[in-house]
């Protein structure tokens, strides 16, 4: 169908390496799921065969959240799980032991898959503003979260001989961008969402406004999650929305056309 890039999440339910002991195939912090690693090998091989690039998502909001798609209660760093040591989800971003676990995870990921031509880049966390325990959608303004992106992004760049792009993704839309995060030298581009929330007449203005907002940071901006509603719509509506976004994205200075959330279409 002409698609040449996709996001792949290393999620707890598929392709993740590190999760709570007792969940099938997982063995807690710093003990990786070799079955899922093998499966990701196959995914990357398949992507290479079809000339498809993968933006590999290392963490996602739910695993560090108590309120949005919450999985924190099962996180292996949570002291409520066997071997865990953290009390609150935001400690994930500031605790030195947690940072060391993330460095090891990044090192393994880069060593095992960094050679692959199909790897486009590494996304440190998807929808990072939905992490934590507060529902304001602005966790990414926390200085500890920004510092985590700087530190882990810098570490990945230091160990990556291939110079893959590094990013951290923000949910909602361009109005939620944090300049302090967007301007980090360790972030190569700024990925974000764009949902029109039941107002299809907003598709073209939303895409155009996203491009305008990205220009302020002098680096590429890319809509990596687009759709009418994250809760879906009819197939006909989805196809119309995708058509509008593809054309709009090609006519404004985005680094690529919006990436549709509903891959099944």
Where are these regions (language model features)?
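Catalytic-core region of carbohydrate-active enzymes that cleave or remodel glycosidic bonds
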Residues: 45-52, 154-165, 181-265
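Active-site mouth of glycoside hydrolases
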Residues: 1-189, 193-201
């Amino acid at each position: 169908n002409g698609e040449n890039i996709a996001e792949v999440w290393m999620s707890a339910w598929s392709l993740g390496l590190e999760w709570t002991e007792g969940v099938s195939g997982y063995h807690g912090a710093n003990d990786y799921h070799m079955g899922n690693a093998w499966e990701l090998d196959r995914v990357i091989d398949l992507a290479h065969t079809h000339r498809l690039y993968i933006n590999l998502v290392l963490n996602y909001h739910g695993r560090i959240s108590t309120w949005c798609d919450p999985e924190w209660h099962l996180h292996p760093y949570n002291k409520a799980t066997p071997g865990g040591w953290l009390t609150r989800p935001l400690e994930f971003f500031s605790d030195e032991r947690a940072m060391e676990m993330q460095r090891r995870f990044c090192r393994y990921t880069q060593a095992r898959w960094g050679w692959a031509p199909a790897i486009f880049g590494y996304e440190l966390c998807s929808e990072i503003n939905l992490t934590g325990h507060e529902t304001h959608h602005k966790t990414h303004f926390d200085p500890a979260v920004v510092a985590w992106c700087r530190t882990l992004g810098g570490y990945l760049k230091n160990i990556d001989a291939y110079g893959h792009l590094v990013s951290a993704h923000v949910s909602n839309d361009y109005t939620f961008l944090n300049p302090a995060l967007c301007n980090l030298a360790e972030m190569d581009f700024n990925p974000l969402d764009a949902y029109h929330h039941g107002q299809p007449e907003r598709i073209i203005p939303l895409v155009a406004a996203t491009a305008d907002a990205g220009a302020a940071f002098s680096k590429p901006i890319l809509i990596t999650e687009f759709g009418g509603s994250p809760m879906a719509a009819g197939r006909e509506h989805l196809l119309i929305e995708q058509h509008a976004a593809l054309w709009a994205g090609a006519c404004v200075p985005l680094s690529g056309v919006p990436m549709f959330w509903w891959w099944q279409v």
